[in-house]
Amino acid sequence: MMNILVTGGSGFIGSALIRYIINHTQDFVINIDKLTYAANQSALREVENNPRYVFEKVDICDLNVIENIFEKYQPDAVMHLAAESHVDRSISGAADFVQTNIVGTYTLLEVAKNYWHTLDEAKKTTFRFHHISTDEVYGDLSLSEPAFTEQSPYHPSSPYSASKAASNHLVQAWHRTYGLPVIITNSSNNYGAYQHAEKLIPLMISNAVMGKPLPIYGDGQQIRDWLFVEDHVQASYLVLTKGRVGENYNIGGNCEKTNLEVVKRICQLLEELAPSKPNHIKYYEDLMTFVKDRPGHDVRYSLDCSKIHAELGWQPQITFEQGLRQTVKWYLFNSSSS
C-alpha cells in the first residue's frame, strides 16, 4: 500500500485517476487541488467518504503549504496533474499557464527533492515523482510524417504546450541534477465523463442538445489521437508502479480522427440517443458551423506507443466507438455534473 499525493485531483483526468486508485488498489490518496473553474468535485463523490481518500485545497505554487502537506502525509509517490490545460485560454492569457504549469511544477520538485533526501534508503529507492504531461509538447506533424516517439524533440506551438514542455524539462533536470526518481508520461487527447464543457467533445454534445451552433475551427481537418480517460489513468498507474525511473512513456489511443469526423460521429450518436431536437432542427449536423481557425493551430498529433506496449504490456481497452457512445450517453443523463 502506498500513500499517493495526486495534484490536480479534482480535474477531469485527476478525478478519474483517483477513482481508479481507490476502486482498484489499496493505496491511500491525498488530493491537492486549487479548485479553479475546471475542477469538479462531483466527479469524486463516490470516493469522498472513503477512509483512504483525503482532500486538501492547495495551490501548488505555495511552497510552505506544499512542504506541510509532504510532512503531514509522508507520500510514497507523487502523481502531478495540476495544470492549466485549455489551449484557447493560453492564447488569450498565458500568465496563469506560466505560473501553474512552470512555477508550480518547480515548487513541487523542490519540495519533493528535499523531502526525498530525508527518507531512509528503502523509501528513497521506491519513491516516485510521476509527471503527467501531453503530446502537444512535440508540436505537430504533417499527414505523411511518422508518429512521435519518446525521442522526438520538443517543438511546442501554443503558450499551453510551451509551458508543459518547460515543466517536462524541469522534471528531467531534477532527475539528472539531483537524482530525484522521476517518470514522465505524455498522453494524447483524453475524453470521457466529467470533462469540462470547454473541451471539444462535451462542448459539441451540450451545444447540440441546446440547438446551439457547433463551432469547428478552420476546415475541421486537424487530426488528433483520442484516448478514453479510463484507459489513460490505468496506464498512468501502471507506469508509476512498473515504469523505469528517468524514462518517458507515450500513452495514446491509436485512434487518429479529424475534428470534423469526431463532430459528425457525435451528431450521428445524438440522432440515435436524443432524437427529439430543439428549435425545430432537422438534423444535428445542420448545427455545424466552420469558424476562423485558432492561431498556430497544430495540424496533426500522433503518438508511437510501442515503448509502453513492449515494456509494460499496456494497450487501450476501449475503442473510440465504445468510448464515445458511453461519453455521449453520460452527458445526456448528467448534464448538471459536467
UniProtKB/Swiss-Prot annotation:
Subunit and partners:
Homodimer.
Q: What sort of enzyme, by top EC class, is this?
A: lyase
Which gene name does the record give? rffG
Record note on cofactor: Binds 1 NAD(+) per subunit.
Q: Known EC number(s)?
A: 4.2.1.46
Its biological purpose: Catalyzes the dehydration of dTDP-D-glucose to form dTDP-6-deoxy-D-xylo-4-hexulose via a three-step process involving oxidation, dehydration and reduction.
Q: In which pathway does it act?
A: Carbohydrate biosynthesis; dTDP-L-rhamnose biosynthesis; Bacterial outer membrane biogenesis; LPS O-antigen biosynthesis
Q: Which residues bind NAD(+)?
A: 12-13, 33-36, 59-60, 81-85, 100, 160-164, 190
Q: Which organism is it from?
A: Haemophilus influenzae (strain ATCC 51907 / DSM 11121 / KW20 / Rd)
Q: Which family is it part of?
A: Belongs to the NAD(P)-dependent epimerase/dehydratase family. dTDP-glucose dehydratase subfamily.
Instruction: Give the protein's cofactors.
Output: NAD(+)
Keywords attached to this entry? Lipopolysaccharide biosynthesis, Lyase, NAD
* Top-rank taxon, per record: Bacteria
Question: Is NAD among the key words of this record?
Answer: yes
What is this protein's record name? dTDP-glucose 4,6-dehydratase
> One Pfam match, by short name?
GDP_Man_Dehyd
A molecular function annotated in GO for this UniProt entry is:
dTDP-glucose 4,6-dehydratase activity
Q: Where is the active site?
A: 135 (proton donor), 136 (proton acceptor), 160 (proton acceptor)
What positions does the entry give for substrate binding? 85, 134, 189, 199-200, 215-217, 224, 259, 293-297
